[in-house]
Regions:
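N-terminal "arm"/small-domain region of PLP-dependent enzymes with the aminotransferase-like
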Residues: 5-34, 43-111, 241
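Active-site phosphate-binding strand-loop segment of PLP-dependent enzymes
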Residues: 90, 192-245
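Short, small-residue-enriched loops and turns at beta-alpha junctions
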Residues: 93-94, 121-124, 176, 195-196, ...
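Conserved N-terminal alpha-helix of the aminotransferase class I/II PLP-enzyme fold
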Residues: 102-149
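Conserved PLP-anchoring active-site segment centered on the Schiff-base-forming lysine
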Residues: 157-176
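Active-site-proximal loop->helix
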Residues: 176-186
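Active-site PLP attachment segment
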Residues: 263-298
Length: 303
């Protein structure tokens, strides 16, 4: 993309904003913040009008079609040649490595395109077990269980292990996948990385719940900062409380050996539950829960 392309793009945005300011009938993203008098069909139609309107000004932001595999450089619709891409979570470029592609091809040739059954009733393959053992060892845990996505790992685990007599203490910045699993249990929101408040509330609520679980991210996806993992570990041990860390954005990136946030803080083996995904640094698809053998045995039965 040359300077003229960039200049033209900026001018189109400025012109669009001017039109929005002058013409109150033009739809903007603000119109979708609160729409109390519209049903879902009306909202979706209006949003599509907004997308179409943006495209008229050369600002297509949704459903941009790629013509090559996602990487640092890729080809997309509307442009000749390659563009620099900042949209991917494939941090290490694993999805485009020849070894990764070859392994995928060999697995399909041997096993087909899917197990076509739940793991508990016949869809559990030897390569699943190998992957579970490998990822558990990699993140410093005893055992692991696989899921079809990182989102499913968080939501599925939490729905399985927490009930009405339990509670989750959650950092205010944790991922939506974790909050979506907190149905049918008690939840308390803790300020972001607020160790002192967590310490106080755990002390105050000692003996009130059967299972107490603190949920944090290793690397927070929306602002990129780290959890205060060593302090969380200390507080949870002090109050006999379980600690769960979603390390989707830390594994493969953080730590001397890329083993995640626990590796970065030299805390491998000290976090009760670690969840993650294969769709980021591993450049593939799927998710996992890694924990003690006792915890994962419960997860395999209930999930």
């Amino acid at each position: 993309m040359c300077f003229l392309d960039i200049f033209t793009y900026i001018c189109s945005i400025i012109y669009y904003l001017y039109i929005v300011y002058m013409n109150k009938n033009i739809i903007s993203l603000k119109d979708f913040e609160i729409t109390p008098n519209e049903n879902v069909t009306e909202r979706s139609q209006n949003f599509q009008s907004y997308i179409d309107q943006m495209e008229q000004f050369g600002c297509k932001s949704y459903w941009v079609m790629g013509k090559t595999g996602v990487g640092a450089k890729m080809q997309i619709e509307g442009y000749n040649g390659e563009v620099s891409a900042y949209i991917s979570n494939d941090y290490l470029g694993m999805s485009q490595r020849a070894e990764t592609k070859e392994a995928g091809i060999n697995a399909v040739l041997k096993y087909g395109t899917g197990a076509s059954a739940a793991q508990a009733i016949g869809g559990y393959l030897d390569i699943h077990q190998q992957l579970e053992q490998g990822i558990a060892k990699f993140v410093g845990q005893e055992d692991a269980i696989l899921f079809s996505s990182g989102f499913g790992a968080n939501a599925g685990l939490l729905r399985a292990i927490l009930g009405k007599n339990d509670i989750a203490y959650i950092d205010s910045y944790i991922h939506t996948s974790a909050t979506s699993g907190l149905i049918g249990t008690n939840v308390k929101h803790i300020g972001h990385n607020d160790i002192d408040y967590l310490d106080m509330i755990l002390e105050r609520e000692t003996g009130k719940y059967q299972t107490r679980l603190v949920i944090i991210d290793g690397v927070y996806s929306q602002n990129g900062d780290l959890s205060k993992l060593p302090e969380y570990i200390a507080v949870c041990k002090k109050h006999d409380c379980l600690l769960m860390m979603d390390d989707a954005h830390g594994i493969g990136v953080m730590g001397e050996n890329g083993r995640g946030t626990a590796d970065y803080y030299n805390c491998l083996g000290q976090v009760d539950i670690i969840t993650g995904t294969f769709s980021k640094s591993f450049g593939c698809v799927g998710g996992f829960v890694a924990a003690s053998k006792k915890t994962d045995s419960v997860s395999k039965i209930l999930c």
